[in-house]
């Protein structure tokens, strides 16, 4: 059975109390009513966070008259928090679960994702994290942020430029470019080791890393031979294999979910456009033609779509097209600089950077109802990369 509801295009800080309705967009989703009991302040926090998670899922929506009724009881424990949940429909029980942990937001996200899965069979993204670069007057920070009011956590700070982070499929590493040594070198931060090491430092540019789906290789941009080209990098041996052989600039690679193709940017016709080639190199096929500037491609997890940045009317916006180049759809309309799109792990959301509220920040858009939410806080933030499912 399918349910119809109205979702609004909104802009708000993640975890904020108020959403700002802008443009109503019809979407199909399952209505869920929430009843949260227990400690008053704690229950209020849980109700707000779970409601935000549900409304941003793209599959469910909160409603006073829901197909499913979720009853949640929250309490404090000596070790943190406890949450007992019961979900029913028409009086028939659908799921009963208990959660314990040190952080109430983590429990809320876990329940929200379980609820999405139990009602739809699809994975939720409430428990996932996003990493991005933040620039302040002191320098540059590689930060990771959960989808709630908790502040971002800096995993690396430098007075020199940090850019183009890419989260590994196993969740343990983020590879990024740093100018710490005076050159644009590739570094790798490991969560398990809580440290970063330099992994590639050939003369010139070492940037725009993109992991293969199996984590066995990275597509990177190197300018070791004069102009920028796409190379494959082995993350264990650090050996490189050149894939593009043109005199033009080739950059911003991204793997298809099968790992057999790479989409990238090239200015071989005089301005940046998107091309696709086999992951072993060879002949490329041009994918874009409707805009004079296209960059930053990102392939969806299901392989059906490619998100990218394109210039239109003097401004830069986020677009999505089918993997064959057809069915082009513009996603952003506010601001003048919307770029760096990256897909969430379920393919229902895209993170990107934008100046739509005046300052450059990281946003997320839910593609079913076109709901937009700001994730980053203060400072100039950009270059998001999404964690895989299961990262904690």
State where each predicted segment sits.
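Residue-level detector of Asp-centered blade-edge/turn motifs that repeat once per structural unit
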Residues: 124-126, 169-170, 213-214, 257-258, ...
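Hydrophobic beta-strand positions that form the internal "hydrophobic ladder"
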Residues: 130, 174, 215-219, 259-263, ...
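Multi-bladed beta-propeller domains
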Residues: 146-161, 190-207, 233-249, 277-293, ...
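C-terminal/domain-edge helix-coil "capping" segments
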Residues: 17-30, 100-156
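Amphipathic beta-strand/beta-sheet edge segments enriched in Tyr/Trp
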Residues: 67-114
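Structural motif
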Residues: 81-82, 138-143, 183-187, 227-231, ...
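A structural "domain/chain start" motif
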Residues: 16-48
């Amino acid at each position: 059975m399918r349910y119809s509801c109205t979702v609004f295009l909104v802009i708000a800080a993640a975890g904020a109390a108020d959403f700002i309705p802008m443009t109503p967009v019809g979407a199909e989703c399952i209505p869920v009513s929430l009843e949260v009991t227990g400690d008053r302040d704690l229950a209020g926090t849980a109700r707000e966070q779970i409601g935000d998670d549900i409304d941003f899922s793209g599959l469910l929506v909160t409603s006073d008259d829901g197909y499913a009724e979720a009853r949640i009881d929250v309490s404090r424990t000596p070790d943190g928090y406890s949450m007992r949940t019961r979900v029913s429909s028409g009086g028939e029980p659908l799921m009963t679960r208990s959660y314990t942990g040190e952080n109430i937001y983590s429990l809320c996200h876990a329940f929200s994702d379980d609820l999405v899965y139990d009602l739809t069979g699809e994975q939720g993204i409430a428990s996932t994290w996003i990493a991005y670069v933040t620039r302040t007057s002191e320098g540059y920070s590689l930060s990771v942020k959960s989808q709630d009011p908790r502040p971002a956590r800096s995993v690396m700070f430098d007075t020199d430029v940090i850019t183009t982070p890419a989260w590994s499929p196993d969740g343990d590493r983020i590879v990024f470019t740093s100018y710490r040594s005076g050159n644009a070198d590739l570094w790798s931060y490991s969560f398990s080791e809580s440290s970063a090491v330099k992994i590639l430092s050939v003369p010139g540019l070492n940037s725009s890393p993109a992991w293969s789906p199996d984590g066995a290789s990275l597509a990177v941009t190197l300018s070791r031979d004069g102009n920028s080209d796409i190379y494959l990098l082995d993350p264990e041996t650090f050996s490189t294999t050149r894939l593009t052989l043109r005199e033009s600039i080739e950059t911003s690679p991204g793997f298809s979910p099968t790992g057999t193709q790479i989409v990238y940017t090239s200015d071989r016709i005089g301005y940046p456009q998107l091309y696709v080639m086999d992951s072993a190199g060879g002949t490329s096929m041009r994918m874009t033609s409707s805009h004079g500037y296209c960059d930053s491609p990102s392939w969806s997890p299901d392989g059906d779509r490619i998100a990218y940045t394109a210039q239109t009317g003097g401004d830069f916006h986020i677009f999505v097209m089918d993997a064959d180049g057809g069915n082009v759809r513009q996603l952003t309309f506010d601001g003048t600089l919307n770029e760096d799109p990256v897909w969430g792990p379920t393919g229902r959301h895209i993170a990107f950077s934008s100046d739509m509220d005046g300052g450059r920040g990281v946003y997320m858009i839910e593609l079913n109802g076109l709901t937009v939410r700001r994730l980053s806080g203060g400072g100039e933030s950009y270059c998001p990369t999404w964690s895989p499912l299961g990262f904690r």
